[in-house]
């Protein structure tokens, strides 16, 4: 099948051209298939004489796992061969090198770039998690990039991977110390959650330029691993609250308090729901159908919300689409929906102002009639504070919290209020505040729609989309 030669190994059907890298027991080469396609592949060449029992087990595990899975963000094992001297794993070639080199040549990655990579890594890990597979050696060196131009992440090197249910525990030390979860070193007892710690270390390194336990010596590294100190995040560069929240929850030393796989995959910063895929366009169109229906029914607020949710899927649909003509058609549709969203925004804003005026009048009358009710006056003061907070830019969540606190009190008071004019006004006030709270919830949903602003800028739609889905 193959035989040794000077310099590069020989393998039937392939021409090996250059060494890409080497590890503990394997060397990886770039190669071309001799077929007409001249397909470029990476060949992992493992010298049999270098294998001990543990490395044979690792190699067999890697082959077993990789031959049974296909995922756009996991390196594909195309075939494997062997001869008297070597075992050859013929794999998908990734021209962009590894994530470690990508990070260090740029020193740090912008949050928006790190987020795209994290979304892709999360997608691969979700696929593995559904099959009870744990990687156990996640690190930037084991994450490859499809190319340097618009790179896609590819998870590689499954030599330490294991079939593990979430409740399985292992006691064998595996992985690289800088990226290894503390429980692997301190307790020699661990489960699948160690992969989540490693994800946190990778994200930390991408954003801050080095892993949290970067050390000058192994003894210093061991001290940091065994310490009980909380992992502190640098203040610079400035990161979004969602990003910092995810990092802190991933880098929780106690696995029982670490973010779960379910919560990781559902985390708003990861946002797997809006990852570019073949389904993005269909999801966007389905939401547009609902938006048009609500629009025709005269429910402007619901229609606006649905149009904005649809646009959240049109963005990844544009990313996913490679055909220039179809891409232009999508952009044209997006332009139409943005225009309608602008019109709906004006309608909703007008209704909002009318609701505010009505609420102020009722509250003034009710305040006059509540001079002998300190608890009622206090609840109305909280409602007034909510109205004031709502006028401040970006304070919707604070205003909503105040509205909910006020409503909690007012509903109790309403139930105990005797029939009469004050009860009627109190009932009206509760209805107004509930409407305000519901409106704010919708506002927050819209604001939390994760527009990839930089992507939209490339499409020339950023400002119009953002302004259309932001109510004043």
Swiss-Prot record:
It comes from Mus musculus. Residues 280-348, 375-444 form the MIT domain. Serine/threonine protein kinase that acts as a regulator of Sonic hedgehog (SHH) signaling and autophagy. Acts as a negative regulator of SHH signaling in the absence of SHH ligand: interacts with SUFU, thereby inactivating the protein kinase activity and preventing phosphorylation of GLI proteins (GLI1, GLI2 and/or GLI3). Positively regulates SHH signaling in the presence of SHH: dissociates from SUFU, autophosphorylates and mediates phosphorylation of GLI2, activating it and promoting its nuclear translocation. This is Serine/threonine-protein kinase ULK3. Gene3D superfamilies: Phosphorylase Kinase, domain 1, Phosphotransferase system, lactose/cellobiose-type IIA subunit, Transferase(Phosphotransferase) domain 1. Belongs to the protein kinase superfamily. Ser/Thr protein kinase family. APG1/unc-51/ULK1 subfamily. The gene is Ulk3. PANTHER family: SERINE/THREONINE-PROTEIN KINASE UNC-51-RELATED (PTHR24348), SERINE_THREONINE-PROTEIN KINASE ULK3 (PTHR24348:SF65). It catalyses: L-seryl-[protein] + ATP = O-phospho-L-seryl-[protein] + ADP + H(+); L-threonyl-[protein] + ATP = O-phospho-L-threonyl-[protein] + ADP + H(+).
């Amino acid at each position: 099948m193959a035989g040794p030669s000077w310099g590069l190994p020989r393998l039937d059907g392939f021409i090996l051209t250059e060494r890409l890298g080497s590890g503990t027991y394997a060397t990886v080469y770039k190669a071309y298939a001799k077929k007409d396609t001249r397909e470029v592949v990476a060949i992992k060449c493992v010298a049999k004489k270098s294998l001990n029992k543990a490395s044979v087990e690792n190699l067999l595990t890697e082959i077993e796992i990789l031959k049974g899975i296909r995922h756009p963000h996991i390196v594909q094992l195309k075939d494997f061969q062997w001869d008297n001297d070597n075992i050859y794993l013929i794999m998908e070639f990734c021209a962009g090198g590894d994530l470690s080199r990508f990070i260090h040549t740029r020193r740090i990655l912008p949050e928006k770039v790190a987020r795209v990579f994290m979304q892709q890594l999360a997608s691969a890990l979700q696929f593995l998690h559904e099959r009870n597979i744990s990687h156990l050696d996640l690190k930037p060196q084991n994450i490859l990039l499809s190319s340097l131009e618009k790179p896609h992440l590819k998870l590689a090197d499954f030599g330490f991977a294991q079939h593990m249910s979430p409740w399985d525990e292992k006691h064998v030390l595996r992985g690289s110390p800088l990226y290894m979860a503390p429980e692997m070193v301190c307790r020699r007892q661990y489960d699948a959650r160690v992969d989540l710690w490693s994800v946190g270390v990778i994200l930390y390194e991408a954003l801050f330029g080095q892993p949290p336990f970067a050390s000058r010596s192994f003894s210093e590294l061991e001290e940091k691993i065994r310490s009980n100190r909380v992992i502190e995040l640098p203040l610079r560069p400035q990161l979004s609250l969602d990003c910092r929240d995810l990092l802190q929850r991933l880098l929780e030393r106690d696995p029982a308090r670490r973010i779960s796989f379910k919560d990781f995959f559902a985390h708003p910063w990861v946002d797997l729901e809006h990852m570019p895929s073949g389904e993005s366009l269909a999801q966007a169109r389905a939401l547009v159908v609902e938006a048009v229906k609500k629009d025709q029914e005269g429910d402007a607020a619901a229609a606006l919300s649905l149009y904005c949710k649809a646009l959240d899927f049109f963005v990844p649909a544009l990313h996913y689409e490679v055909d220039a003509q179809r891409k232009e058609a999508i952009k044209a549709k997006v332009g139409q929906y943005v225009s309608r969203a602008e019109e709906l925004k004006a309608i909703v804003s007008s209704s909002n102002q009318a609701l505010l005026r009505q609420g102020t009048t009722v509250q003034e009358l009710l305040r006059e009639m509540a001079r002998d009710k300190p608890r009622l006056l206090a609840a109305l003061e909280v409602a007034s504070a909510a109205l004031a907070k709502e006028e401040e830019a970006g304070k919707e969540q604070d205003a909503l919290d105040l509205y909910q606190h006020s409503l909690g009190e007012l509903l109790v008071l309403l139930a105990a209020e005797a029939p009469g004019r004050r009860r009627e006004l109190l009932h009206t006030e509760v209805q107004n505040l509930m409407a305000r709270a519901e409106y704010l919830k919708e506002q927050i949903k819209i604001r939390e729609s994760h527009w990839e602003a930089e992507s939209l800028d490339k499409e020339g739609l950023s400002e119009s989309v953002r302004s259309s889905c932001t109510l004043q």
